[in-house]
Amino acid sequence: EMLRSLVGSEMCIRDSNWTMLTDHTIKFNKLLTPFSFLYGIGVRFRNQLFDWKILRTERYDLPIICVGNLTVGGTGKTPHTEYIIRLIKDRYRVAVLSRGYKRKTSGFLLADQRSTSKDIGDEPYQMKRKFPDILVAVDADRRRGIRNLLALPENKRPEVIVLDDAFQHRYVAPTLNILLTDCHRLYTQDKLLPAGRLREPVDGARRADVIIVTKCESCIQPIDFRIIEEDIHLSAYQELYFSRILYGELEPVFSGKAPRRTLKGLASTTEVLLVSGIASPAPLEKEIHKYTEHVTSLVFPDHHAFDRHDIQKIQTAFKRLTSTSKLIIITEKDAARLRDLPSLPMEWFSHLYCLPITVGFCMDREKQFQELIVKHIDTRIKNHPI
């Protein structure tokens, strides 16, 4: 938790400066370098125990797709996990298994329509709301979580399990390991915690079958792709893809209380209060600035648990907006935490919107990625029928 808080403070500095490091942060990172060295010794030793088979990795017959990263902070795991769900949910019985970060419960929990973000965590709650027909489960012990999913009745038992943020959970061996890295801060250019954001050394990327460089600009040039490809040093068995964020239509947080709107439909005079409690809010703010110059941003820590004091802070900022056309925009993850609070001001109901995001693949390789996923699942099921 100490490491997480140190890194969290660093990320606030990065986001507020569009990922530019300040002199203060650089000096701070240098002071933390010895701790990164010690942390690296521990992580390398743990990985060696798995490589030497002293710590046992569990293997399963059904397809298990892991979506993860080498760093703390936002690389886009949730939208990429949702992309895979959307691709395969009508073909197979799908389960998503997550740790359920910052939930108030413990152990294995299978989500249902009554589950809240406090029960299962922000991301699992968001996925269950979006895809009510799939199985969403949480358990910090992924092996136990998988055992519980496979113990379900045959007509409910998953044919495919997607592991959300489990790249470092080496007690489970995925059949397909997908590693994400932010285009603006590749893992090859980062440092170990707490001086940087790496959870483990760069050579951990060798466990990946697929590497996706995320959050690319739509105007990125072919030369940029080649530079990144050379920097990552792919192994022969690895495939490289590039993806970008796609922003959807604004959705009322309280259905029926506000009209549907689009970012493109915003008037240039519209005032927006952007409230975010995510790891990397800067790209979102940049996107909204394309449509209106009048953006006030309130940034909270990632996975922040909003309380009445936060509501008052947001309300004060909202009242300062003087335009007759004004709204509050939040992320889908923040909507999961705000929606059920009992103390929301009534006037927000007609002004509160969330901005959903999806991902698209660059260089016309979307179909190739889809075929890779489906072929992997079909081959695995054919060779290991459930």
Task: Indicate residue ranges for each PLM-predicted region.
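Single conserved hydrophobic/aromatic residue that forms the stacking wall/gate
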Residues: E1-D15
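A transmembrane-helix-recognition feature enriched in membrane-embedded lipid enzymes
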Residues: R14-L62, H376, H384
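C-terminal accessory "lid"/substrate-recognition subdomains
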Residues: S16-T25, L186-T324, N383-I386
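Residue-level signal for inorganic ion chemistry
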Residues: L38, T78, M127, D164, ...
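Walker A (P-loop) phosphate-binding motif
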Residues: N47-Q113, S218-C219, N383-I386
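Phosphate/Mg2+-binding loops and adjacent switch elements
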Residues: G100-R103, G107-Q238, F242
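Short, flexible loop segments at boundaries between secondary-structure elements
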Residues: L246-G248, F300-A305, E347-T379
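Acidic beta-strand-to-loop metal/phosphate-binding motif
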Residues: K326-K333
